[in-house]
Amino acid sequence: MKSKRGFTLLEVLVALAIFATAAISVIRSVSQHINTVNYLEEKMFAAMVVDNQMAQVMLNPQSLAAREGSEQMAGRTWYWKLSPVKTADNLLKAFDVSVATEKGATPVVTVRSYVAN
């Protein structure tokens, strides 16, 4: 009897199972990378909005009062909130700036800073 050349069905199925396992791992890795990039992008733009609001306070520290508003950046609307914080002495004024992606949502970034009184 002549021997036939080629792969058996079992060999093909084993190879396919190995390939499928590897492909699933690659897909999960790429998906996680995309999620991380989106998260870092959101944090970066929120930090830029915080920087803008902190600069406004630094330019005019006498007008430090609780307020909130919105700002356009990177084609999105960011909602910020400025909150004065009491300090132990009168040498410094403290304030928090929080930025969220939706009004009333949990802030993406919150930063505390100080200005001279």
Swiss-Prot record:
Transmembrane helix keyword on record: yes
GO biological process per UniProt: protein secretion by the type II secretion system
Transmembrane region(s): 7-27
Topology of the protein relative to the lipid bilayer: Single-pass membrane protein
InterPro entries cross-referenced by the UniProt entry: N_methyl_site, Pilin-like, T2SS_GspI_C, T2SS_protein-GspI
Main localization (coarse): membrane
Location of this chain's protein in the cell: Cell inner membrane
Residues that bear N-methylphenylalanine: F7
One cellular component term from this protein's GO annotations in UniProt: plasma membrane
Residue ranges the record assigns to the propeptide: 1-6
Modification after translation, per record: Cleaved by prepilin peptidase.
Keywords annotated in UniProt: Cell inner membrane, Cell membrane, Membrane, Methylation, Protein transport, Transmembrane, Transmembrane helix, Transport
Biological function: Component of the type II secretion system required for the energy-dependent secretion of extracellular factors such as proteases and toxins from the periplasm. Part of the pseudopilus tip complex that is critical for the recognition and binding of secretion substrates.
Assembly mode: Type II secretion is composed of four main components: the outer membrane complex, the inner membrane complex, the cytoplasmic secretion ATPase and the periplasm-spanning pseudopilus. Interacts with core component EpsG.
PANTHER family the record matches: TYPE II SECRETION SYSTEM PROTEIN I-RELATED
Similarity section: Belongs to the GSP I family.
Protein name per its UniProtKB record: Type II secretion system protein I
